[in-house]
Amino acid sequence: MQAYQRDFIRFAIERGVLRFGEFTLKSGRTSPYFFNAGLFDSGLALARLGRFYAEAVIDSGIDFDVLFGPAYKGIPLAATTAVALAEQHQRDLPWCFNRKEAKDHGEGGTLVGAPLSGRVLIIDDVITAGTAIREVMQIIDAQGARAAGVLIALNRQERGKGELSAIQEVERDFGMPVVSIVSLEQVLEYLVEDAELKKHLPAVEAYRAQYGI
């Protein structure tokens, strides 16, 4: 685990974004942990989050021309990542996002920001079922651009209905990498090292044994 990954997990726990206990997921599974990126909900938290995304962008080595934030949750994530890449890594890159509804006045269309062209890095919080990413791929294709990869905050590393995770299905179907700031593997490492949170380790390990990939 890299230093920025450890710092991100600590930050997510401090903000209440990553919590341990008993949670019912949309899938119906009872999970021993829950991740809600919507709780990075202050200016300072968003600025810091962008720096973690930027670190993961650099770490991934993915070659791309433009950042894309899918509506709605991906919009502030792409914006703060673009700011952090420029300020922390001297990489001033274009970014854009889509609207869910097309406008018939002003700039029109469903895309806002820089042109969606060349190699596109998609920025989002998590991939649950992969439905949102499939919609994004249609937007990218329609612009004649191509997806270079996807960056998310957390990879839960768990199976969907079949043997693969939604992330593995996206990688297989579109031939592109999906990378994350951290995965469940790093969360487990963090729990091992943290005296106070170690008590949650057996439940998380049992969950991974049942649903992990």
From Swiss-Prot:
Reaction(s) catalysed (UniProt annotation): orotidine 5'-phosphate + diphosphate = orotate + 5-phospho-alpha-D-ribose 1-diphosphate
UniProt cofactor(s): Mg(2+)
Molecular function as annotated in GO: magnesium ion binding; orotate phosphoribosyltransferase activity
Lineage top rank: taxon: Bacteria
Keywords: Glycosyltransferase, Magnesium, Pyrimidine biosynthesis, Transferase
Matching CDD domains: PRTases_typeI
Pathways per UniProt: Pyrimidine metabolism; UMP biosynthesis via de novo pathway; UMP from orotate: step 1/2
Coiled-coil ranges from the UniProt annotation: none
Record-linked Pfam families: Pribosyltran (PF00156)
Gene Ontology terms: biological process: 'de novo' pyrimidine nucleobase biosynthetic process; 'de novo' UMP biosynthetic process; pyrimidine ribonucleoside biosynthetic process
Annotated 5-phospho-alpha-D-ribose 1-diphosphate binding sites: 26, 72-73, 99-100, 103, 105, 124-132
Annotated positions binding orotate: F34, F35, T128, R156
A GO cellular-component term linked to this record: cytoplasm
Entry EC no(s): 2.4.2.10
Described function: Catalyzes the transfer of a ribosyl phosphate group from 5-phosphoribose 1-diphosphate to orotate, leading to the formation of orotidine monophosphate (OMP).
Family annotation (PANTHER family): OROTATE PHOSPHORIBOSYLTRANSFERASE 1-RELATED
Quaternary structure, from the entry: Homodimer.
Family assignment from sequence similarity: Belongs to the purine/pyrimidine phosphoribosyltransferase family. PyrE subfamily.
Name recorded for this polypeptide: Orotate phosphoribosyltransferase
Encoding gene (name): pyrE
